[in-house]
Amino acid sequence: MITDEQLNTIALTFGFASIILIIIYHAISTNVHKLEDETPSSSFTRTNTTETTVASKKKK
């Protein structure tokens, strides 16, 4: 059988590991969102190109 001390050690280890994983996930998630905000998205470029094409056709 597992003793109370072993169970306590296992519970603390898993708790500590889960907190560390949450912190790492948050750091990665935040950095990804910042990178997405800084770089222009390809959908914006496509939309902008489409609007330019439509506008040039209307002028003719």
From Swiss-Prot:
Residues 41-60 have a biased composition (Low complexity). The chain crosses the membrane at residues 7-29. Its main location: endoplasmic reticulum. Residues 37-60 are annotated as: Disordered. Keywords: Endoplasmic reticulum, Membrane, Signal-anchor, Transmembrane, Transmembrane helix. Component of the oligosaccharyltransferase (OST) complex. Pfam families: Ost4 (PF10215). Residues 1-6 are lumenal. The keyword Transmembrane applies. It is a single-pass type III membrane protein. One of its GO terms (biological process) is protein glycosylation. Subunit of the oligosaccharyl transferase (OST) complex that catalyzes the initial transfer of a defined glycan (Glc(3)Man(9)GlcNAc(2) in eukaryotes) from the lipid carrier dolichol-pyrophosphate to an asparagine residue within an Asn-X-Ser/Thr consensus motif in nascent polypeptide chains, the first step in protein N-glycosylation. N-glycosylation occurs cotranslationally and the complex associates with the Sec61 complex at the channel-forming translocon complex that mediates protein translocation across the endoplasmic reticulum (ER). All subunits are required for a maximal enzyme activity. InterPro entries: Oligosaccaryltransferase (IPR018943), Ost4p_sf (IPR036330). This is Dolichyl-diphosphooligosaccharide--protein glycosyltransferase 4 kDa subunit. Residues 30-60 are cytoplasmic. It comes from the Eukaryota. Disulfide bonds: none annotated. Belongs to the OST4 family. GO terms for cellular component: endoplasmic reticulum membrane. It is found in: Endoplasmic reticulum membrane. Pathway: Protein modification; protein glycosylation.
